[in-house]
C-alpha cells in the first residue's frame, strides 16, 4: 500500500490531524464552548467516522522510527493491546456516528465523552507526549 515507511507515517499523521480537527469541533459543542448545531455536528461526526478507518492501516513494519513518528514502541511490542485500543476507538466512533444521526445533543455529548476517552486511552499508552 505504501511505497516507503515514511509515506505510511505521514499518512497516519495526516489522518489523525483531520480526525482531531473534526472531532474537536463537535467536542467544543459538547463542552459548551461553541453553540450546538445538530447539522454541523452530524457533518463533522460523519467525517470522523470515515476518517477513523484510515490511520490504523499505516502502522506496518518499519513505521516505528523516523519521519517524526510519535508512536511508542508499545504499538508493535504490545500489538494485541494496540488492537484492543483501536477496537475500542472504532466502537466509540460507531456510537458517536449513531448519536450524530439523531441530532440529539445529550446523545452526542455522551458519545463525545466516550470517544474522547478512547482517544486518550490509546494516546496514554501508545503515543509519545
From Swiss-Prot:
| Gene Ontology molecular function: any one | electron transfer activity
Locate the residues binding heme c: 12-13, 69-70, 119, 122-123
A GO cellular-component term linked to this record: periplasmic space
List keywords of the entry alphabetically.
Electron transport, Heme, Iron, Metal-binding, Transport
Instruction: Describe PTMs of this protein.
Output: Binds 1 heme c group covalently per subunit.
Instruction: Please report a single Pfam family linked to this protein.
Output: Cytochrom_C_2
Source taxon at top rank: Bacteria
GO BP term, pick one = electron transport chain
Task: Say what the protein does.
Answer: Cytochrome c' is the most widely occurring bacterial c-type cytochrome. Cytochromes c' are high-spin proteins and the heme has no sixth ligand. Their exact function is not known.
Q: What is this protein called?
A: Cytochrome c'
| Native species | Rubrivivax gelatinosus (Rhodocyclus gelatinosus)
Amino acid at each position: 500500500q505504501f511505497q516507503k515507511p515514511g509515506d505510511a507515517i505521514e499518512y497516519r499523521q495526516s489522518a489523525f490531524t483531520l480526525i482531531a480537527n473534526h472531532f474537536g469541533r463537535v467536542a467544543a459543542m459538547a463542552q459548551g464552548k461553541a453553540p450546538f448545531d445538530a447539522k454541523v455536528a452530524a457533518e463533522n461526526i460523519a467525517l470522523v467516522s470515515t476518517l477513523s478507518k484510515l490511520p490504523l492501516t499505516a502502522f506496518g513494519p518499519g513505521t516505528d522510527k523516523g519521519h517524526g513518528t510519535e508512536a511508542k514502541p508499545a504499538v508493535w511490542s504490545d500489538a494485541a493491546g494496540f488492537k484492543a485500543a483501536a477496537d475500542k476507538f472504532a466502537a466509540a466512533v460507531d456510537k458517536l456516528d449513531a448519536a450524530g444521526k439523531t441530532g440529539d445533543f445529550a446523545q452526542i455529548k455522551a458519545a463525545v465523552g466516550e470517544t474522547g476517552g478512547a482517544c486518550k486511552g490509546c494516546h496514554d499508552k501508545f503515543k509519545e507526549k
